[in-house]
């Protein structure tokens, strides 16, 4: 079966808890059994707080709304905090997962989010306003989102780098 993704852009919804939700992909999957085929759906979503918090979830079910709800719930449970600097990243970083590699670079104010599909959804929900990204290798939405999150979680703040080197933050930023 061919993979199907929702082609229409999804607005980042805000529910009563103040979190932004975005659907990245929905795939129709089939299980072949003795009596025929069983159709199902797999949803991939990201949730963020608009201030550096982001989580990813996937859900599977026989119906789309149930799969999406399961994915949203998992994304809320897996929310992680990433330190940002003036709406962009602290430094350039490469994230990897499987065959997907994602190169992320901070950008000056006013640049906007220059990123494709799944990466853009991650940055929009977490509150990044200026970033430049390039996806290398696999374009599988799940692997691209995981690679993006792996890279973001590996970002070090100037204070962390200074502590590792035994220097002050002013010496690091020089």
From Swiss-Prot:
Transmembrane segments: none annotated. It holds the Pfam family Ribosomal_S5_C. Residues 19-82 form the S5 DRBM domain. Gene3D superfamilies: 3.30.160.20, 3.30.230.10. GO terms for cellular component: small ribosomal subunit. Keywords: Ribonucleoprotein, Ribosomal protein, RNA-binding, rRNA-binding. GO terms for biological process: translation. One of its GO terms (molecular function) is rRNA binding. The keyword Ribosomal protein applies. The N-terminal domain interacts with the head of the 30S subunit; the C-terminal domain interacts with the body and contacts protein S4. The interaction surface between S4 and S5 is involved in control of translational fidelity. PANTHER family: MITOCHONDRIAL RIBOSOMAL PROTEIN S5. Belongs to the universal ribosomal protein uS5 family. Part of the 30S ribosomal subunit. Contacts proteins S4 and S8. HAMAP family: Ribosomal_uS5_B. With S4 and S12 plays an important role in translational accuracy. NCBIfam families: rpsE_bact. This is Small ribosomal subunit protein uS5. It comes from Aromatoleum aromaticum (strain DSM 19018 / LMG 30748 / EbN1). The lineage of its organism: Bacteria, Pseudomonadati, Pseudomonadota, Betaproteobacteria, Rhodocyclales. The gene is rpsE.
